[in-house]
């Protein structure tokens, strides 16, 4: 065996190693995509109302204060499991009523509590956001958040 590495040996090791890790990366990317689309996301329940609720979530900047499954700001509570915490995850009508009542009667002046803005949402928008939060609550997320309180 030679003690000196030639340029061609170094080049072959570099290209071979690069190709190996590129193939590993592509395989893991394909696996992640397949897992997300086929296992973790329930696309069958992704209705127009859920999509509209996600759109409202984005345009109203809810993520600037709240988190969903750990993504977002930590200024206000996690909402990924809010329907389970409220006990309304089995009833879309109860979820709608609970969300609407909560957002319309935000308590003010409580020490240590931040005030949520009033968004002047219509019933259709409340329904869409509650459907989005119900859908988010149904995601198989490997027990995230780690506590029931979010």
Describe each model-derived feature in a short phrase.
Residues 1-46, 135-150:
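Post-cleavage N-terminal segment of exported redox proteins
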Residues 18, 53-54:
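Short N-terminal secondary-structure initiator segments
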Residues 31-32, 36, 44, 58, ...:
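Generic signal for short, ordered secondary-structure residues
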Residues 47-48, 55, 69-73, 81-143:
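Extracytoplasmic electron-transfer domains, predominantly the class I c-type cytochrome c fold
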Residues 54-60:
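Local sequence-structure signature of Cys/Sec-based thiol-disulfide redox active-site neighborhoods
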Residues 62-65:
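Short cysteine clusters
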């Amino acid at each position: 065996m030679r003690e000196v590495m030639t340029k061609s040996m170094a080049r072959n090791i570099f290209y071979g190693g690069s190709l190996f890790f590129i193939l590993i990366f592509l395989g893991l990317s394909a696996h992640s995509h397949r897992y997300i689309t086929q296992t973790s996301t329930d696309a069958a329940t992704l209705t127009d109302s859920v999509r509209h609720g996600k759109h409202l979530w984005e345009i109203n900047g809810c993520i600037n204060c709240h988190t969903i499954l750990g993504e977002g700001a930590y200024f206000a509570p996690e909402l990924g499991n809010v329907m389970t915490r409220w006990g309304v995850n089995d009833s879309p009508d109860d979820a709608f009523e609970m969300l609407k009542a909560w957002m319309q009667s935000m308590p003010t002046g409580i020490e240590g509590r931040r005030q949520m803005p009033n968004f002047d949402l219509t019933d259709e928008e409340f329904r869409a956001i509650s459907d989005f939060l119900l859908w988010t609550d149904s995601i198989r997320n490997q027990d995230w958040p780690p506590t029931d309180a979010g």
